[in-house]
């Protein structure tokens, strides 16, 4: 049972990195226990945490009960409060049994309401093929009185005597909830039959709606009231007559929908104020919002709190195995452990562990245009019509036979002609370009920060006091058209600058969240039955020996904490809630015969064979506040000895995306997207510029053999100031920092720039997530070049942004650039004035071009190791660390230089420490714990 010590960098157990206890601990174990471990290795293998099925023993077993591998414990006490659900169990481990705490799990049933903001699909489910401006058959009454009737009369009937009411009366009397049928039309093909318009009557169904209401067909819904599909129980019939009132032309069936018409998944994008009297606007589907439990049920169990979120103790000792530490990393440790044990991109059904991820094309905009292909056309269904405007009039022609050198006789009988001149009439549709632009607008522009959006006309969040974290608000904000479009960084592989600091995991293309949402079904209301693992004990299998124990946990009920949404809206404000109806504990027992079990119990009762379990990251975490606009952070750590210290890992978090530490219910947490602090969805690593580590000693650390000065780690360097060429990989990361990350991830430093031999797939490692980028663009310091793209919206209630019309591109073929991008096409065809060409003979000159470089490194913690495996640190001992640091007390100052951000953030620091809990069970019903931690002892704040 080798002592595997977690490495902070990739959370991979690596023996050579830990110098405290040596490479193994077998020397401390009794010979009998070593033999037992060898014989039963499959029970205890860390990388086989969820073990293969083991056949229960058949000999030396006296009762059938002893062969059962899994037993259900019902709670002896529950406490259901508005914000939490507490369960307490009395766990009885019988004689000859050994309970594996690491493999136990909670079996939970309940009812979940994901709230009205839940929308697990894109587009609309109601008339999705209707044009966005299309109006359904409407009957509108307004003051005056004035009645406006608009629509199609699609049902026909035989009406040979037009001044006779009989045929029309029959149609009026047949009007019902299904007659006339809105799904039927005349049923005539234009070329197959030409109806005699004097012998037919027409009937249509019309909806009476509010004059000020929405009338568009796209997204319109009225619920049925009968099993035949009728949507109203009452129909009002009207007769359709000619202007003289003598000829019966047809009938209308009018149903009143003023109270029943709804738009469940769409919203009206109103035109700008100046056009509101002459433009009815266009429809837009509400944004998709997948909502499900978090990856591995993060935050469902109340972890990491100083108020004793979990309790495991025995009858005779009140000590709690669940050590109360607010800086533990239970959730994040579990993420890293799974990533090291298996692929995070498989086995999604287990423990809800569909990992958060994002579509790379959304994060890094690879704008290689579109595949043009040959022209694509749309044709009339019958394939006939006037193809040319200038041609002979063929409407009243006669056809003659062929005679002698001239026409013959006119063709006998009735001859009907429908002839047109020219090619088949058509409309060209650039499907590839339109599809590409749709992707850009719905996947990138829609997720721009709110400061690059403006409100549609009629929506005033300030006056109406609408919280910007609500789903209602998000659907009524539209992006500036020019920030990202088909021409943005054309030809480059470059993330949209305005999107770099936006959480890419809060997206409907987060496949893991989408899976977890779909696992619960497609209704906002669902009954769930889930299995939640015991993360606290999952690292080491804490084996409970025979006795009676009290086990207690608190389950959260805050929807923002336990649920995750792709939009990150405030689920509490949007009406989501959860009710637990049953929480049982499923306990797993070792399938061993009595002799083996008794021998194991005797050995584990021995104090020399105590069990240990540890936080997998082996780290103490701390959050340091960085105010909005700040670029500097200083961390002062009081003097202490640094034995057991393995290094620093750090990244950056948004304050709005980080709940209050240790809070069971954080009132100010109005966010439900990914929580990087808990789930590892880091995405702000690129905002660090440099880091320095200074000890109060004359010895430089980590030495002078790196490219840059001692104590300073320059993470990135602007291209303009990199005259020495210290950056690499076509980005602004320094060679020195690249070396440090290669060292801490793959133990490759002086081996050169090469790949590591390990074939294991790491989810959270450096090279997998390192994404360098470069591009060129116009130098707008040149007075002859003009930056036409404005990214600052004007705050008004007109629904228009005139600055966007500076750009002319696709004029006449899209909505006006100053209008919301979802409105209808306007304008005239015109030569484009943007972007400046960077290719071909017309490219702007080289002295007008500037180079841009940057990188992203999501899902990753920057790491600086403090170990002999890193680099020179002065005189080393066999413990692998300079005695100046390990044997003497020194204070430390860490300085960060960061990119400014327009909101409050935290620097998230993980200090690699020796952190272990030792558990001893000397006799029945006794649990004794000893807690070891260095260099940061329990409760010490940095």
Curated annotation (Swiss-Prot):
Induction or repression: Expressed in the late phase of the viral replicative cycle.
Alphabetical list of InterPro entries matching this protein: Adenovirus_Pll_hexon_C (IPR016108), Adenovirus_Pll_hexon_N (IPR016107), Adenovirus_Pll_hexon_sub2 (IPR044942), Adenovirus_Pll_hexon_sub3 (IPR016110), ADV_hexon (IPR037542), VP_dsDNA_II (IPR016112)
This protein's UniProt keywords: Capsid protein, Cytoplasmic inwards viral transport, Host nucleus, Host-virus interaction, Late protein, Microtubular inwards viral transport, Phosphoprotein, T=25 icosahedral capsid protein, Virion, Virus entry into host cell
GO terms (BP aspect): microtubule-dependent intracellular transport of viral material towards nucleus; symbiont entry into host cell
Major location (coarse): virion
Record GO terms (molecular function): structural molecule activity
Modified residue annotations for Phosphotyrosine: 931
Location(s) in or outside the cell: Virion; Host nucleus
Function according to Swiss-Prot or TrEMBL: Major capsid protein that self-associates to form 240 hexon trimers, each in the shape of a hexagon, building most of the pseudo T=25 capsid. Assembled into trimeric units with the help of the chaperone shutoff protein. Transported by pre-protein VI to the nucleus where it associates with other structural proteins to form an empty capsid. Might be involved, through its interaction with host dyneins, in the intracellular microtubule-dependent transport of incoming viral capsid to the nucleus.
Additional free-text comment from the UniProt record: All late proteins expressed from the major late promoter are produced by alternative splicing and alternative polyadenylation of the same gene giving rise to non-overlapping ORFs. A leader sequence is present in the N-terminus of all these mRNAs and is recognized by the viral shutoff protein to provide expression although conventional translation via ribosome scanning from the cap has been shut off in the host cell.
Listed HAMAP family: ADV_CAPSH (MF_04051)
Family membership noted in the UniProt record: Belongs to the adenoviridae hexon protein family.
Name of the protein described by the UniProt record: Hexon protein
Species assigned in the record: Fowl adenovirus A serotype 1 (strain CELO / Phelps)
Organism lineage: Viruses, Varidnaviria, Bamfordvirae, Preplasmiviricota, Tectiliviricetes
Gene symbol of the encoding locus: L3
